[in-house]
Design a protein with these regions (language model features):
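Conserved SAM/SAH-binding beta-strand->alpha-helix loop
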Residues: 18-20, 38
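Conserved beta-strand signature within the Rossmann-like core of class I S-adenosyl-L-methionine
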Residues: 82-93
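Core SAM-dependent methyltransferase catalytic element
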Residues: 113-131
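Conserved SAM-binding loop of SAM-dependent methyltransferases across substrates and taxa
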Residues: 1-8
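Conserved SAM-binding loop
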Residues: 25-26
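A short glycine-rich, Lys/Arg-flanked "PGG" loop and its adjoining helix->strand segment in the class I
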Residues: 72-84
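A short SAM/SAH-binding and catalytic strip from SAM-dependent methyltransferases
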Residues: 54-70
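A short acidic, Gly/Pro-enriched loop at the edge of an enzyme's catalytic core
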Residues: 45-56
Length: 131
């Protein structure tokens, strides 16, 4: 869907934990950058692209399966790679934001509920403070 909206494939970086699914993504989308590894260790997973900055991000790890400290670290790491105010869209499968807002650091707002996702998902938008 992202590519259908006109994003140049060479600008898209995807992080996938599963080696087999990462291989499948590379076959299906040869022009995008697929990084196989752990999003919770983004610096290591990005390798040569470790200093990469994002215009925005879409994140879908099942955060509610992880300790709060790990969730906060992931959200903070992603937001630190973006300009203040740019959106981080996080999929989640619970009724509440997987990481609450942090005054002075980031805000969170409920964006949408996606029934077509299996299981149905809520979308949350996180933004770094300071804009």
């Amino acid at each position: 869907a992202i590519l259908e909206r006109g994003l140049q494939p060479g600008l898209l970086h995807a992080v996938e934990y599963s080696a087999s699914f990462a291989s499948e993504l590379r076959l299906r989308f040869p022009s995008i950058h697929v990084h196989q590894g752990d999003a919770f260790s983004l610096q290591e997973t990005l390798g040569a692209h470790a200093d990469l900055r994002f215009d925005c991000a879409v994140s879908a790890p099942p955060l509610l399966n992880f300790p709060v400290a790990m969730r906060e670290t992931l959200i903070g790491d992603l937001l630190s790679r973006m300009s203040p105010g740019r959106p981080l869209i996080q999929f989640s499968y619970g009724p509440f934001a997987p990481v609450p807002g942090r005054a002075g650091q980031w805000s969170v707002e409920r964006y949408d509920f996606v029934l077509r996702n299996m299981p149905p998902a809520r979308l949350w938008i996180y933004r770094q403070s300071g804009h």
